[in-house]
């Protein structure tokens, strides 16, 4: 049933792009906000972020956990749909691709957990002072992305409905 597999794959791509677009935009906006004060994008510059920017730490944790595919965040739905679409193909190459994806997911999750550990457990780097503030536009972007990341994980039907190809084709007519 190749048509079902093709539709499943296309739907998972749309879901993945929407969710990961929000999640990555939010994460990079946090990196920009932190780098404005620390003058660095290095992981170490996030040290002790919880002590001087708890809100930013929580938001970045949401984005990183979503990127790692931790439920109930949007990244979990995106990864689940992607793996399901690949496995629906039922071929040996699909299983190999899923195994490679699983290994990549585990490696990426370890990286994201490392960043979270630095933010929550490490001390603030020596000589780093200043409060992290964001312009309203960046703050709004981070907030919208965080809300979208959480809501699409809890209510995945919102993005799944958007990814319904029959509806998308109907809109294009």
What function would you assign to each model-found segment?
Residues 1-173:
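Alpha-helical transmembrane segments of multi-pass membrane proteins predominantly involved
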């Amino acid at each position: 049933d190749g048509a079902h597999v093709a539709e499943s794959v296309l739907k998972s791509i749309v879901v993945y792009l929407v969710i990961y677009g929000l999640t990555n935009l939010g994460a990079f906006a946090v990196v920009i906000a932190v780098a404005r004060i620390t003058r660095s994008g290095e992981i170490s510059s996030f040290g002790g972020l919880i002590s001087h920017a708890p809100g930013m730490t929580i938001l970045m944790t949401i984005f990183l956990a979503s990127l790692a595919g931790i439920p109930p965040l949007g990244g979990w739905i995106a990864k689940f749909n992607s793996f399901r679409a690949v496995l629906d193909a039922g071929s040996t190459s699909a299983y190999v691709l899923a195994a490679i994806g699983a290994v990549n997911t585990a490696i990426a999750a370890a990286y994201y957990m490392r960043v979270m550990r630095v933010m929550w457990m490490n001390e603030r780097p020596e000589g780093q002072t200043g409060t992290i503030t964001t312009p309203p536009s960046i703050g709004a972007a981070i907030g919208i992305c965080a809300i979208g990341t959480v809501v699409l994980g809890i209510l995945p039907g919102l993005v799944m409905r958007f990814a319904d190809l029959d509806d998308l084709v109907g809109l294009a007519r």
